[in-house]
């Protein structure tokens, strides 16, 4: 249940950030864009343990951001399920941004320009034309982020530790069972559950994406 909670919240909290970053990278040009693109994709190449450590020194109770959040808002990420969600968000960020960005780049901008010439505001064009046409990529990004969050281990254990009932997701529970003699069957059971959930989420993602593309007339 905790794994589904963490993997469910992570894509939802990440979605607005992912849409904004994808739009910035797909539709704008400015000095430093390459740097932002590299930072967004950095979690793909950095070891998850490094990401967890960076989160610990920045967002932990004594971190330069986490300390301020705790003093001002009473919000703490370290050693809590919220921290596990944050770790999954960082790890899944490039997958979501990449999916949405590719979908945005495939949108025919002539449709947006036609709407603008008819008097539609940029915001209305975005919500009535751009966003609906990008939905297949958004759905794919959400499901990929969900599946990636289910399998997250390194950043989570580095940032929020392995606390049963609070931060112990399926991968962390598997690690605990593997370290405990005689618990191989429990680890195998969790492995089977993880595979089933991951395959199911990827299947649903593909099905929803194809259905949305047919409804939008993007496929023949």
What are these regions (language model features)?
Residues 1-11, 24-33, 74, 176-185:
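Periplasmic/extracellular loop-to-transmembrane helix junction in inner-membrane transport proteins
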Residues 9-40, 53-55, 103-105, 110, ...:
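Transmembrane-helix boundary motif in ABC transporter permease subunits
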Residues 98-112, 116-117, 185-220:
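C-terminal transmembrane helix and the adjacent membrane-cytosol boundary/short C-terminal tail
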Residues 60-61, 138-176:
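Non-cytoplasmic
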Residues 52-89, 159-164:
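Membrane-interfacial helix termini and adjacent extracytoplasmic/periplasmic loops
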Residues 97-100, 104, 108, 122-155:
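Transmembrane alpha-helices
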Residues 28-36, 64-65, 80, 110, ...:
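Membrane-helix interface segments
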Residues 157-207:
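Interhelical loop and adjacent transmembrane-helix boundary motif
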